[in-house]
């Protein structure tokens, strides 16, 4: 008799995706983050669903409804902090996942990579709208500043901003629509994840050497299911330590003050995971230029496959490219730090230099060094 997992139509899909999937025998822990991201997404949807049962998307009651969740709902505080810190874990895994893709040349699977970049944009949009929902000071002013950037778009900008606001400022209509989109987008993201996996399973996984591993494959289960469970346990441990010991460590104290349009906070800044892009935005004195740089800081990922000049796919055997990659990582940490600092000397000039370096490494230095390494191979 045929095994049910190989005959039932639904089980066949699950079997070919998670059980009998041929996987390279040498993929390292850097390949764990895909499954961790899937778990993060499931966690966010679940906690978000339960939070939405108690939340009200009205300017008069939003802040109080979040307070009510924390004080009066059974384990509401756990739900709220799991959701808030779950977003941080989501972005940590996302950035490590993208970093792995750049280091090991996974971007050569262009369809998978491009869907991944669109996913990154979708997750960033969802997180931004979620930050507005508690209707604290930083929620209100963050929404005002970031949506106002769209007014830099020539000709249609001002009308576009009013259309997004649903009025002449961030108000009741804005909060309601942000809640609607924040609820909807994770399900769109889930569908896009399926497309991401569909494209990935067309080619199979890359591996640390960057050499095709068709000769040496092993089944996904039990080898990588066990490995993924270990990664999951480590991530859940870090998340629970955050939630139970210092739930507000990554948040902004200003968000514990109800939104007040008459009182601007001294330093308006987004959540930590957007600080690098915020620093790039602020480092350009021109509004439209800043907005373009902000969008390009993520959109530049799309052209990375076109900039690949090396004869080798992975950076495993390319020490010069490795140096550049880690310089890029250090640069992103610098930008994240600058994004959280006030706009004054010396932070402005450091931010500008770090922004120039960011675009230079990706667009100029990496292709050139890869080209040079090709010639070094002949020595």
UniProtKB/Swiss-Prot annotation:
Its cofactor is heme b. Its main location: mitochondrion. Heme b b566 binds at residues 97, 196. One of its GO terms (molecular function) is metal ion binding. Keywords: Electron transport, Heme, Iron, Membrane, Metal-binding, Mitochondrion, Mitochondrion inner membrane, Respiratory chain, Transmembrane, Transmembrane helix, Transport, Ubiquinone. CDD domains: cytochrome_b_C, Cytochrome_b_N. It is found in: Mitochondrion inner membrane. InterPro entries: Cyt_b/b6_C, Cyt_b/b6_C_sf, Cyt_b/b6_N, Cytb/b6-like_sf, Cytochrome_b, Cytochrome_b_C_euk/bac, Cytochrome_b_N_euk/bac, Di-haem_cyt_TM. PROSITE patterns: CYTB_CTER, CYTB_NTER. Heme b b562 binds at residues 83, 182. Binds 2 heme b groups non-covalently. A ubiquinone binds at residue 201. The keyword Ribonucleoprotein does not apply. One of its GO terms (cellular component) is respiratory chain complex III. The chain crosses the membrane at residues 33-53, 77-98, 113-133, 178-198, 226-246, 288-308, 320-340, 347-367. It is a multi-pass membrane protein. Heme 1 (or BL or b562) is low-potential and absorbs at about 562 nm, and heme 2 (or BH or b566) is high-potential and absorbs at about 566 nm. PANTHER family: CYTOCHROME B. Component of the ubiquinol-cytochrome c reductase complex (complex III or cytochrome b-c1 complex) that is part of the mitochondrial respiratory chain. The b-c1 complex mediates electron transfer from ubiquinol to cytochrome c. Contributes to the generation of a proton gradient across the mitochondrial membrane that is then used for ATP synthesis. The cytochrome bc1 complex contains 11 subunits: 3 respiratory subunits (MT-CYB, CYC1 and UQCRFS1), 2 core proteins (UQCRC1 and UQCRC2) and 6 low-molecular weight proteins (UQCRH/QCR6, UQCRB/QCR7, UQCRQ/QCR8, UQCR10/QCR9, UQCR11/QCR10 and a cleavage product of UQCRFS1). This cytochrome bc1 complex then forms a dimer. Belongs to the cytochrome b family. This is Cytochrome b. It comes from Myotis oxygnathus.
């Amino acid at each position: 008799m045929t095994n049910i997992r190989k005959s039932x139509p639904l089980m066949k899909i699950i079997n070919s995706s998670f059980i009998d999937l041929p996987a390279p025998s040498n993929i390292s822990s850097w390949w764990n983050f895909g499954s961790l991201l899937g778990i993060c997404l499931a966690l966010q949807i679940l906690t978000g669903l339960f939070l939405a049962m108690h939340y009200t998307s009205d300017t008069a009651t939003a802040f109080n409804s979040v307070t009510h969740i924390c004080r009066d709902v059974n384990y509401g505080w756990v739900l709220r902090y799991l959701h808030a810190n779950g977003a941080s874990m989501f972005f940590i895994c996302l950035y490590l996942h993208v970093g792995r893709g750049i280091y090991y040349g996974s971007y050569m699977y262009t369809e998978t990579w491009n869907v991944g970049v669109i996913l990154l944009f979708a997750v960033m949009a969802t997180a931004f709208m979620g930050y507005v929902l508690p209707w604290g000071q930083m929620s209100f002013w963050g929404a005002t500043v970031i949506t106002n950037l769209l007014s830099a778009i020539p000709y249609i900008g001002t009308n576009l901003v009013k259309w997004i606001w649903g009025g002449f400022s961030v108000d009741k209509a804005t909060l309601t629509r942000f809640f609607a989109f924040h609820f909807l987008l994770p399900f769109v993201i889930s569908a896009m994840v399926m497309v991401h996996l569909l494209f990935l399973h067309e080619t199979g996984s890359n591996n640390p050497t960057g050499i095709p591993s068709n000769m040496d494959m092993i089944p996904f289960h039990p080898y990588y299911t066990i490995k993924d469970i270990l990664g999951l346990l480590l991530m859940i441990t870090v998340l629970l330590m955050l939630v139970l010991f210092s739930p507000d460590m990554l948040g902004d104290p200003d968000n514990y003050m109800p939104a007040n349009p008459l009182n601007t906070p001294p330093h308006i800044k987004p959540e930590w995971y957007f600080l690098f892009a915020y620093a790039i935005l602020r480092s350009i004195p021109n509004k439209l230029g800043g907005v373009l740089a902000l969008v390009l800081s993520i959109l530049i990922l799309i052209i990375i496959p076109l900039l690949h000049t090396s004869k080798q796919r992975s950076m495993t055997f390319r020490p010069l490219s490795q140096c550049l990659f880690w310089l890029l990582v250090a640069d992103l940490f610098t930008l994240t730090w600058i994004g959280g600092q006030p706009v004054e000397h010396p932070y402005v000039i450091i931010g500008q230099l770090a922004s120039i370096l960011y675009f230079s490494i990706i667009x100029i230095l990496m292709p050139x060094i890869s080209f040079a390494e090709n010639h070094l191979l002949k020595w």
